[in-house]
Design a protein with these regions (language model features):
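Non-heme Fe(II)/2-oxoglutarate
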Residues: 1-28
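Conserved short hydrophobic patches within well-ordered secondary structure
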Residues: 12-13, 62-67
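Short, conserved, surface-exposed binding loops centered on an aromatic residue
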Residues: 14, 27-33, 53-58, 72
């Protein structure tokens, strides 16, 4: 448990590590994930965005975004979109309800995603979590992640 986080967050964090959750995630996605790799709080505000990009870390990586932004209006930019290639004009899905929702994408060579430029005075609150295949012998199925030397929550 992390003393910097409240009891609700610690309960949520513990659940994300549970066999119950991991088995449900594997069953739902069909992706052989074994454990959580990263857990990050993310806050985007007016002027925030993320250019479209592709990680392609490996075939056993899921990226999950949980959103906690009340009153997000349909069509407003800021949710993590999914695109057919690393080009904002190729968006195929963009969440519009960011109040207690989630987006799951399987990482790979065609999993382009990003967030359009936020023009309103709003805050997009989210948690970004990577789940990935892991072995004691070989480590993470997708290798080390960018920022591995930095502390993660």
């Amino acid at each position: 448990l992390d003393p910097k986080l409240g009891p609700e967050w610690n309960k949520f964090f513990k659940f994300l590590h549970s066999d119950e959750f991991l088995n449900a995630l594997k069953k739902f996605s069909g992706v052989a994930v074994d454990k959580m790799k990263t857990f990050r709080f993310v806050l985007y505000q007016k002027g925030g965005f993320q250019l479209p990009h592709i990680h392609n870390d490996g075939p056993s990586t899921l990226i999950v975004f949980f959103y906690f932004s009340k009153g997000w209006e349909k069509g407003d930019p800021g949710g993590t979109y999914v695109a057919s290639e690393a080009d904002e004009s190729k968006i195929i899905f963009e969440p519009y309800n960011l109040d207690n929702t989630m987006v799951i994408l399987q990482d790979g060579p065609y999993s382009a995603h990003g967030a359009r430029y936020i023009v309103k005075d709003v805050k997009r609150k989210a948690i970004q979590i990577y789940f990935e295949g892991y072995s004691e012998e070989t480590g993470w199925s997708g290798g080390e992640y960018e920022g591995a030397d930095k502390p993660q929550v």
